């Protein structure tokens, strides 16, 4: 005779779900860090940004 399995608790479900989210976020963070490095070193060819010489309203 078949016996129903115990139901997975909400906390267990949340732990397992967060594990997958963490892995995805780590990958995204790695890409963002790589892009930031290429911008700071001047090697970025696909990202355009404006460079300001002086900040407006500076006290110096």
Curated annotation (Swiss-Prot):
One of its GO terms (biological process) is translation. Pfam families: Ribosomal_L32p (PF01783). Keywords: Chloroplast, Plastid, Ribonucleoprotein, Ribosomal protein. It is found in: Plastid, Chloroplast. The keyword Secreted does not apply. InterPro entries: Ribosomal_bL32, Ribosomal_bL32_plant/cyanobact, Ribosomal_zn-bd. GO terms for cellular component: chloroplast; large ribosomal subunit. GO terms for molecular function: structural constituent of ribosome. It comes from the Eukaryota. Belongs to the bacterial ribosomal protein bL32 family. This is Large ribosomal subunit protein bL32c.
């Amino acid at each position: 005779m078949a016996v129903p399995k115990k139901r997975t608790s909400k906390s267990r479900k949340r732990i397992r779900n967060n594990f997958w989210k963490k892995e995805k976020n780590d990958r995204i963070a790695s890409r963002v860090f790589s892009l930031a490095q290429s911008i700071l070193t001047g090697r970025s060819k696909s990202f355009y940004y404006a460079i300001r010489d002086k900040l407006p309203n500076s006290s110096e």
